[in-house]
Every structure is written in structure tokens, then in C-alpha cells.
């Protein structure tokens, strides 16, 4: 779809990144009240409703192949978000995003297998080592492992998203995927007990979270992808760990040490470098 605001593509991507990270900051603010699993369930569930209204997918027209991939796509989407929220309930958002980013970064690099790409692998390993739980910074090991697991689900989401984009329209795929994401993570939200305490204020915050983390960035990114080369888009997305750290600092007063900032920088440079030196089509 074309953005009615006619935002130029590069600012649109930057706004989308900021929107997602502001959403993550709002989400973390809800953790003390309803918990990470319930927050993820609330966000994904409301996102599914919003996107279903916006794109009105016709479930009766899906064939067996579409059902197969959209279910797997939805499960990876839901688990990626829930595991990430569980991670940032234990470690700072900026570090959680940095560690999660390793998943798609490694996927992109090893899909190429060129010598120069191993430089980016090494740099990303340095970034992980700088914030590893066995270092002197005392990070929560379960938070680190959950962030890395979220990265695995993110890589799966990218692979499945690429396949499903060839057999379904983008908006329809995401809307149906969100429905299955809700199915897979809603039980965790219910069993955690967090959803039992929902009230109008929390529902409004949940709706804002769904808009900031799903509807707004999805719309902006779809419009930008039609105008930007894939490489440029990937380089811009490399800013995400830094943007996450900035949003967490502004909204949650989460401060990173110099070592942790260096770790974020290593992953940002590795991701940008991988995108810049990538071979591939511009469309």
C-alpha cells in the first residue's frame, strides 16, 4: 500500500524503527503490572485484530501450501516476540535487541559464505563476548540466552516470510500470521495470570503497543521497500540496536556502560557492513 502521508522512504524506515523500539519501551513498562508473557499476548492479539480489520484476509481461499507456510510463519512470529519480551524483562532493551540481531545477521552472512563476510561474523562475536554473562558486567544469563533464542526465531521468521511472500499478498500474510501467533502465545499469557488483571487503561496501552510495534512500522516499511534498494533498506535496519538503546534510555532511563555501548556498536557495524558488501538484487 502507498502511504497517504507520502513520507520519503529513508525517513519512513527510520520512523518505523523508532516506532518499534518505542513500542518495546512501552511493553517493558507493562511488565511489572502484567508480566512479559501477558504483554506479548496482548500486543500480538490486538495487532491481529487491527491487521485483520485493515487487510480483511479471506481464510476460505487459502490453499494447503499457503496454510502450511502461514501457520509456521505465525508461530515463528509469535514465539520471536514472546521470547524477546521475556529476554528484555531480564536485561536492558538495547542489549536484548543487539543479541537478537545476531540471528538474522548470521543468516545473511552464512547465506553468502564469502571471505569478507567472516570479518562481520568475527565482529558480531566480539559484540557478544563484550556483553556475555561470564564477563564482569553480571548480565542475567537467562536473559542473554532468551535474546539469542529470539534471534533464532527471527531468522526462521525471515526465511518463512521470504517463502510466503511468493504465494500470498504481504498484508494478508501478516494478518493471518498474527492470528496464528496469537494462538501459539495466548496460552502463555493466560497461564501467567497477567491477562486476568486487564482494565481499560491497560487495553489502551496494549492498543498503542500494537500500533507502534506492528501496524505503523509494517505500513511504513512496505511503502519504503517499494522505493528503496534492498541493500539500503538493510543498512538502515542495522541502526535498530542503537535506536533500541536510545529509546530505552529516553523512556526507561536504562543506561548502558561503555563496554555495552561498544558491543552494540560492533553488531551495528557488522550488520551494516554485511549489507553494504552483500551481493544481490536491488529489488
Give, region by region, the residue ranges found by the protein language model:
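C-terminal-most transmembrane helix of multi-pass membrane proteins
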Residues: 2-3, 44, 202, 238-283
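Hydrophobic/aromatic residues within transmembrane alpha-helices
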Residues: 30, 39, 43, 87, ...
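Specific alpha-helical transmembrane segments that line the substrate/conduction pathway
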Residues: 38-41, 45, 85-115, 150, ...
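Helix-helix packing/entry segments at the starts of transmembrane helices
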Residues: 42, 97-99, 160-182, 214-250
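Loop-to-transmembrane alpha-helix entry segments
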Residues: 64, 97-100, 110-131, 137-144, ...
